Swiss-Prot record:
TM region positions: none
Keywords: Autophagy, Cell projection, Cytoplasm
Species assigned in the record: Caenorhabditis elegans
Region entry Disordered, spans: 232-283, 308-333
Subunit structure: Interacts with unc-51 (via C-terminus). Interacts with lgg-1; the interaction is direct.
Name this polypeptide is given: Autophagy-related protein 13 homolog
Gene that encodes it: atg-13
Length: 443
């Protein structure tokens, strides 16, 4: 007798697990092929049906359900979840067991359980939820979630709810009953969800001032959290088995995108861009930036070019038609060079007063005493510094031999061979000039 009761409990536990697996898999929207066999050749094929169990559902049941019928009542509930956070209960499958009768003579309980399991699989595909919502699930519209708990207190199905008894099996150990409650009015109403947490010791005040304490024995067990059907579908496609969390719940692994009003993803990524660096890349340095501290005698170039427009001043232009120097000319001394630089300040004042009056090139004849003129003061601060090096350099420039005769050179009518011969004839003079220049460095 004890062995028969243990067998009854074993059959009922495996029936509960197969029923939950079959009904949840019917909500995936995929076609499932279930083949019936005349007898069970494999111990896994319970109730003459081969059902592929999903590891996620098995782990969920293992962590949440501690006792199966006939000890307790098992409830499988499906809810519709919207992106706005609203939950709408759609179905509730309740498997319960009651006391049996001793005069029951039926001994085909195992085959009756197989028939009841097939009836549940067929009924799961005939409900309004399956016809209207199962194949239309989407993350942006709605998803179907499920939860399993150990009591018969399901959520309110709203007005017009219907109840159907899928089947009832009678045995001497107990009567097994499977009931279906489903919604017909698809509108959100309050309250929709049954209490998720058990009620603690609540004190209610009566009009006469007395207090009554609610008995803990009549309180319901903790209701497990909801699990999206889409997660079970993903695990089935990938074939992976994941253990449930300590709370027995599983949330969606796919995070919804975050949208910020008035801000795009590209603007958020580029908000740290450096505007100043982009400006500096496009900025081209001016002439003053390039020439400062780039080569010696920068003040001479400063006097020849105007940094504002980069044009060459007439007063500092060197004419190629200047008269050829004679040996009788005296070399300028350092004192004369200093006087010419000091005179540049006076010339600058006169030049600013008569800035609009430009002098022709022919009227500007160079002399030994005034071979360098500054039209404006240096932008680098103060008057140009004078020294022996600058005076020696100017002497070398004056003593350099002329390579061409005075006069205009007509490049178009020039005979290249003749010009090369002239240059070759001046090679000796140029070599002597180089020796003369090198002698200063040797000293």
């Amino acid at each position: 007798m004890v062995n028969e009761y243990d067998t009854y409990n074993k059959w009922l536990k495996f029936f509960s697990v197969r029923m939950v697996q079959s009904i949840i898999q019917s909500r995936l929207g995929d076609e499932i092929e279930s083949k019936c066999v005349p007898y069970s050749e494999n111990a896994v094929d319970w109730f003459n049906m081969r059902i592929d169990e999903l590891g996620e559902i098995s782990a969920y049941l293992k962590s949440n359900i501690k006792s199966y019928p006939p000890v307790g009542t098992l409830t499988l509930e499906f809810l519709l979840y919207t992106p706005s956070g609203q939950l709408l209960p759609l179905e509730a499958w309740i498997l319960s067991s009651s006391e049996g009768t001793d005069d029951c003579s039926r001994n085909e309980l195992y085959h009756d359980m197989s028939t009841l399991l097939r009836s549940a699989i067929v009924s799961a595909r005939m409900t309004p939820m399956h016809r209207l919502y199962v194949k239309k699930q989407h993350l942006e519209t709605f998803v179907i979630m499920y939860r399993v708990f150990e009591n018969d207190i399901s959520s309110d199905m709203g007005k017009g709810k219907k109840t159907r008894k899928i089947g009832e099996l009678v045995s001497k150990f107990g009567n097994i009953s499977l009931d279906l409650h489903y919604r017909t009015s698809m509108h959100f109403e309050e309250p929709e969800i049954a209490p998720v947490t058990p009620v603690e010791d609540v004190e209610e005040e009566i009009d006469d001032g007395e207090k009554t304490v609610v008995d803990e024995n009549i309180q319901t067990r903790t209701v497990s959290e909801c699990v999206p059907i889409a997660d079970a579908k993903k695990r089935k496609a990938s074939g992976s088995v994941e253990s449930a969390t300590s709370a027995g719940s599983s949330t969606s692994r796919e995070a919804a995108p975050r949208f910020i009003l008035g801000q795009s993803t590209s603007s958020e990524d580029s908000r740290h861009s450096d505007v100043q660096n982009s400006y500096e890349e496009d900025h081209k340095p001016s002439l003053a930036d390039l020439r400062n501290h780039s080569f010696p005698f920068v003040n001479l170039l400063q006097s020849a070019y105007n940094p504002a427009n980069g044009t060459k001043k007439n007063s500092s232009s060197t004419c190629l038609n200047s008269p050829k120097s004679t040996p009788e000319d005296k070399e300028p001394t350092i004192e004369k060079v200093a006087e010419s630089f000091r005179a540049a300040k006076i010339d600058e004042v006169v030049f600013e007063e008569d800035e609009d009056e430009e002098l022709p090139l022919d009227s500007m004849e160079l002399s030994e005493d005034s071979f360098v003129h500054f039209n404006q003061l240096s932008d680098f601060g103060g008057a140009p510094s004078l020294g022996n090096e600058l005076g020696d350099y100017l002497k070398q420039l004056k003593t350099a031999p002329d390579m061409t005769e005075s006069g205009d050179i007509d490049i178009c009518n020039m005979d290249l061979k003749t010009e090369l011969e002239k240059i070759s004839s001046q090679t000796a003079n140029f070599n002597n000039f180089l020796k003369h220049v090198n002698s200063f460095s040797d000293e």
